[in-house]
Regions:
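Short, well-ordered alpha-helical
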Residues: 2, 18-143, 173-175, 292-303, ...
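Short, well-ordered beta-strand elements within core beta-sheets of diverse protein domains
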Residues: 53-60, 141-145, 262-269, 510-511
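Glycine-rich, small-residue loops and helix-cap segments
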Residues: 61, 118, 124, 159, ...
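Short connector loops at secondary-structure junctions
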Residues: 346-365
Length: 545
């Protein structure tokens, strides 16, 4: 094999082979044959490098985690702090180099812990770490507010040997502060940018997590989703995003919006990388009651479902009504993707109707649920902080923003915070009625009916539109996405790059029932391997006329 770019000839068997050898603690010798695609340490090309590329290089002694962290820090300086100024990275973990050095020593002495050993990962800024970093959800009001312990998923990533490189920027309060608003803006970071065309939105609220992976500022990242906050940034930034079933990953230690819709997921440049990160995070957690439902339904390793032959015979539905029609360019690429799925042996059921899918009615019920749950969840999170926080209640946050309006409210208001504060408790009939409507119409009388009547394994649709221009006066020009039914029902999604429209990435989303991650991973991986549609960003200032 010739000297090619990282990631170029590594199929699923390489991923499984390397993972098995790492787990077994075997010597480096059997891996030399897989190393031909890896450059020497002095010219290791981190751009588009996968977890397997990196692990092969590390196992062969051609790279170490400390060097990898240094490479990413240099790229962050060149692309995030200067140059295109992406503003994807909220802050750097001051201990990242020391952690990487310790993990390198452990690798030399005892071998790697997992596929994530020594792999740098960014966390969305609403995921708690009890270290030297802040956890603020992009809000100045939470600067100095210290969590008492790491979020559970952070504990699991650390146990797997991941290097927490830093915190990724995000839409402030996970895009639950005002309407209108601008995705990717926060008082702490300012406006983050889409790396493909810099004056375009990165979407949100997991903006920085997606940007950083797209721009090769980190190997993989963690985000959260309530309704579209992983899937939309994945689509417009040309990366893979996995939004798991609610309860598959713990939300303990995550600044919340919704107890019934929030979930923690992964971003990668490939389905394999995002899947490897997901595998490290799943499992029951006594700190999050929602995970109790996952007992016996989770897998310790989702990598086994990376099957390039996962498409033949799969029944995939196409929900035209409500999921297509808001972007001709996205529709065109989605239709091309559907043709690929059909050519690769999938049985396409087109069209499929999801009953009771009235976006206006569902959104009205959803916002009611979120207002109630946000107030309850944020107050509980703030009450559990260590001493010294400058805010302890949602009302404190609102008043802080009023006192410091120049910094906190320069473009938009905080009407969602105010509306949430006006709500009562979670025993309020208005809340209970709205929640029942969301679950019933989104799931068992909506998405579930379409899946069952058509005997589907999954559905597929455009992820969202190509990225729209950033507008700090009028806010986002959001027209639609694939997230709504899954958000209301708590179901999983995987967005995969499907191509580009005028230089802007477009994704397609695979949608499934609760706990159907194995099926979705098979389908997403099969499509990815058939198309290889991802292209690295070019950092254009604007689109050519």
């Amino acid at each position: 094999m010739g000297d090619v770019a990282p990631g170029a000839g590594l199929a699923r068997r390489d991923f499984l082979r390397v993972g098995g050898m790492l787990a077994a603690g075997l010597s480096t010798m059997p891996l030399f044959g897989a190393c031909a695609s890896i450059r020497r340490p002095t010219d290791f090309n981190v751009e588009e490098a996968t977890i397997v590329d990196i692990q092969v290089a590390m196992t062969a002694g051609r790279l170490d985690s400390e060097s990898l962290v240094q490479i990413y820090l240099q790229r962050i300086q060149e692309l995030d702090r200067t140059g295109p100024m992406l503003r994807a990275v909220q802050e750097i973990n001051p201990d990242a180099i020391a952690i990487a050095r310790t993990l390198d020593a452990e690798r030399s002495g005892r071998g790697p812990r997992s596929l994530l050993h020594g792999i740098p990962v960014l966390l969305k800024d609403n995921i708690a770490t009890a270290d030297k970093m802040e956890t603020t959800a992009g809000a100045l009001a939470l600067v100095g507010a210290r969590p008492r312990q790491d979020a559970t998923i952070v504990q699991r990533l650390r146990q797997a040997g991941a290097v927490i490189l830093g915190k990724a920027s995000m839409s402030e309060w996970a895009y639950f502060k005002s309407t209108p608003s601008s995705s990717g803006w926060s008082a702490r970071s300012g406006q983050s940018r889409n790396p493909y065309v810099l004056n375009r939105t990165p979407c949100g609220s997991s903006s920085g997590s997606a940007i950083a992976v797209a721009a090769n500022l980190v190997t993989a990242s963690i985000g959260t989703e309530t309704d579209g906050s992983i899937i939309c940034p994945s689509g417009v930034n040309g990366v893979v995003g996995i939004k798991p079933t609610v309860g598959l990953t713990s939300r303990a230690g995550v600044i919340p919006i919704s107890a019934t819709q929030d979930t923690v997921g992964a971003f990668g440049r490939t389905v394999a990388d995002a899947t490897a990160v997901l595998s490290a995070m799943v499992g029951v957690d006594p700190r999050d009651p929602a995970t109790q439902a996952s007992g016996g339904l989770t897998r310790t390793d989702y990598i086994q479902y990376l099957e390039a032959t996962g498409l033949p015979g799969a029944r995939i539905g196409v929900p035209r009504e409500g999921y297509f029609g808001y972007s001709p360019k996205a529709d065109a690429l989605a239709n091309q993707a559907i043709d690929v799925l059909r050519q690769k042996g999938a049985v396409i059921v087109d069209p499929v109707k999801i009953p009771n899918f009235d976006r206006v009615t569902l959104t009205a019920a959803e916002i009611t649920v979120l207002l109630y749950e946000f107030k309850a969840g944020v107050n509980a999170y703030l009450a559990g902080l260590a001493p010294g926080a400058q805010v302890r209640t949602l009302d404190d946050i609102i008043e802080f923003n009023k006192r410091n309006a120049g910094d906190n409210l320069p473009f938009f208001g905080q009407e969602l915070l105010v509306r949430a504060q006006a709500k009562g408790g979670l025993d309020d009939p208005e809340y209970l009625e709205a929640l029942e409507k969301c679950r019933r119409l989104g799931g068992k009388e909506g998405f579930d009916v379409a899946m069952n009547e058509n005997r589907l394994d999954a559905m597929v649709a455009p992820t969202t539109t190509p990225a729209w221009p950033i507008d700090l006066v009028n806010g986002d020009q959001f027209r639609g996405s694939s997230a709504k039914s899954a958000a209301l029902a708590g179901y999983p999604l995987i967005s995969v790059p499907a191509g580009q429209a005028s230089g802007l990435p477009v994704g397609i989303t695979f949608m499934g029932r609760a706990w159907s991650e194995p099926t979705l991973i098979k389908l997403a991986y099969g499509f990815e391997q058939a198309t290889k549609a991802r292209r690295p960003p070019q950092y254009l200032g604007t689109l050519p006329v």
